[in-house]
From Swiss-Prot:
This is Imidazoleglycerol-phosphate dehydratase. The gene is hisB. One of its GO terms (cellular component) is cytoplasm. GO terms for biological process: L-histidine biosynthetic process. It is an enzyme of class 4 (lyase). PROSITE patterns: IGP_DEHYDRATASE_1 (PS00954), IGP_DEHYDRATASE_2 (PS00955). Signal peptide: none annotated. PANTHER family: IMIDAZOLEGLYCEROL-PHOSPHATE DEHYDRATASE (PTHR23133:SF2), IMIDAZOLEGLYCEROL-PHOSPHATE DEHYDRATASE HIS7 (PTHR23133). It catalyses: D-erythro-1-(imidazol-4-yl)glycerol 3-phosphate = 3-(imidazol-4-yl)-2-oxopropyl phosphate + H2O. Pathway: Amino-acid biosynthesis; L-histidine biosynthesis; L-histidine from 5-phospho-alpha-D-ribose 1-diphosphate: step 6/9.
Amino acid sequence: MVERKASVERNTLETQVKCSINLDGSGKARFDIGVPFLEHMLDQIARHGLIDLDIECKGDLHIDDHHTVEDVGITLGQAFAQAIGDKKGIFRYGHAYVPLDEALSRVVIDFSGRPGLQMHVPYTRATVGGFDVDLFQEFFQGFVNHALVTLHIDNLRGHNTHHQIETVFKAFGRALRMAVTQDERMAGQMPSTKGCL
């Protein structure tokens, strides 16, 4: 099987991001981003997606977390697009429901080649540990725009904002894992009647 790995660097006047991924990993993760809550959530993607992730970012955190969070999402999306290749033989679609105590979230993804995000998370607080939770919309928008995926995120219930977010990221990791898995019966075939994605 061809290795499905990618390393991407993205440099702007606001951030310098390096991202390496292995879609067929074991969930190993290393982060040096400077935003602890974001790193905690990225760890959920790696662990539950069985994707090896290594991300470094030097960003303008003296202003706020916005550029760093968005640009990490963009760079991760670019890395996914590169690692997934021509998409032949993958399941393409992935979905997961994940609970954490009172919280329950659903994530559905399609490696369609068409970027689109529907994110419905009724946060009960504006911040968690000083982190502006609205920035996760920017993270996922950056990801879908550059991974070229359609992504539906719904927090179905929950009143602890940390739990709401953590269930979203765990479900995202598990949906990714399902979608990028190689289907032996589809070996060498494009998972689309169009013949391309």
